[in-house]
A protein has these predicted regions:
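Chalcogenol-based redox active-site neighborhoods
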Residues: 1-212
Length: 212
């Protein structure tokens, strides 16, 4: 099935590197980064999971849980985790789903037949505590993901969930933000944006990040 932004991320139960896992129950009230990789014991995937492991403190600060997926069995995941930890100098503190029957891969449309009929492509979903899909990214098998960008988008989503703002191109935490066009009333502008704003055009109003 095709998952669109705002859709509820489907629940599932599947084996994993930490045993049988019920997805929604495991996710709890956290944000989730769910990402698939083509296969265990492959070079690009090893670097990606190593990076994810090293970013655990950053994920923790944002109330984010990471979970990976491939169609390899749990026993193979366990052996590969040892390799990841040795070669990437880290500890893998997140589960890897063992989707041998490809049920989760199909549910999340992670197998693209024109890329591979059996292996999952590099799909990534950011899912919020309400289990809604907030970001969907798909990378080709030859290209590793940019996890700094994943963190940047999570920062933007969490900021815009809490404040009536939008983030401009290349925004990063601490930069100025945009006032949405839906806010026009002068009194509301004063109330919501006490730091003031500058307007390059009536539709382009910039204000300091409200929680900084």
């Amino acid at each position: 099935m095709t998952l669109r932004l705002g859709d509820v991320a489907p629940d599932f139960e599947q084996d994993s590197s930490i045993g049988p896992l019920k997805f929604h129950e495991w996710a709890g009230n956290s944000w989730v980064v769910l990402f698939s990789h083509p296969a265990d014991f492959t070079p690009v995937c090893t670097t990606e999971l190593g990076l994810t492991a090293k970013l655990k403190p950053e994920f923790d600060k944002r109330n984010v849980k990471a979970i990976a997926l491939s169609v390899d069995p749990a026993e193979k995941h366990a052996a590969w985790i040892s390799d990841i930890e040795q070669t990437q100098d880290t500890v893998v503190g997140f589960p890897i789903i063992a989707d041998e029957d490809r049920s989760v891969s199909s549910l999340y449309d992670m197998i693209h037949p024109n890329a591979s009929t059996t292996a999952t492509v590099r799909t990534l979903f950011v899912i919020d505590p309400a289990k809604k899909v907030r970001l969907s990214l798909t990378y080709p098998m030859s290209t590793g993901r940019n996890f700094d960008e994943v963190l940047r988008v999570i920062d933007a989503l969490q900021l815009t969930d809490g404040y009536t703002v939008a983030t401009p191109g290349n925004w990063k935490d601490g930069d100025d933000v945009i006032i949405p066009l839906t806010v026009q009333d002068p009194e509301v502008l004063k109330q919501k944006y006490p730091k003031g704003f500058t307007a390059a055009r009536p539709y382009l109003r910039v204000t300091p990040q409200p929680n900084k």
